């Protein structure tokens, strides 16, 4: 499970709405990170429940490497989508970015469980 930003170690600062509600940059920053991680962990637990495949949760440079120009940077930075997540597929490196056919459907099932859970968690967090 990958969280923005991929271009560096900075944490996302989509704090405008939350800043008005909470009242301080530090509290807001911590709240954003807590919400991101809580939602990501809930999605990750849903992934695991499908086929008991373990995924890690963390920022891209912390888990992989610094990489600019990724879709997470674009969706959060340019489009302002506050819950921007990415996935590294379930293969552990033997096939690169090409999953073997027998891993495609299980990966799709895991990703469906993740996205459904993340959507529910976001609704629970923000819809009265």
Residue ranges and their predicted role:
Residues 1-128:
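C-terminal accessory segments enriched in acidic
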């Amino acid at each position: 499970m990958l969280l923005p930003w991929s271009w560096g170690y900075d944490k996302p600062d989509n704090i405008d709405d939350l800043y008005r509600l909470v009242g301080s940059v530090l509290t807001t920053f911590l709240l954003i990170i807590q919400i991101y991680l809580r939602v990501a962990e809930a999605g990750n637990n849903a992934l695991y429940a499908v086929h008991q495949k373990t995924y890690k949760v963390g920022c891209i440079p912390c888990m992989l490497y610094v990489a600019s120009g990724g879709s997470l940077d674009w969706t959060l930075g340019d489009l302002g989508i506050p819950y921007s997540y990415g996935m590294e597929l379930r293969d552990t490196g033997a096939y690169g970015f090409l999953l073997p056919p027998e891993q495609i459907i299980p990966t799709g099932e895991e990703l469906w469980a993740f996205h459904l859970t993340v959507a529910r968690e976001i609704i629970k967090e923000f819809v009265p």
